[in-house]
């Protein structure tokens, strides 16, 4: 048994102890069984959260949503760092403009997410 599969088996056992349900589907990457957590998430013991899609269109939607979430996270991190730096010099006009751009980008991104879910 390889080291990766040993770790996967140990994580799978831990998931079962925590009340997860083993599913008949397998991870498309490592072929380990998938588990459904109590909160409804489907996870691979090796790779973490897995999204099960039934069609190519559904796969595109999931990928797009994941990318939008990642972009949103990056924007929020940048906004946080800019706001933190602004405490050092509250009158820095370039920093203020940068914060406004982050807020504008976040607003646009959220509108895209709302429109794409309709």
From Swiss-Prot:
InterPro entries linked to this entry: SSSCA1, UPF0148
Pfam families xref list: Auto_anti-p27 (PF06677)
Family: Belongs to the UPF0148 family.
Protein's UniProt name: UPF0148 protein M1627_1409
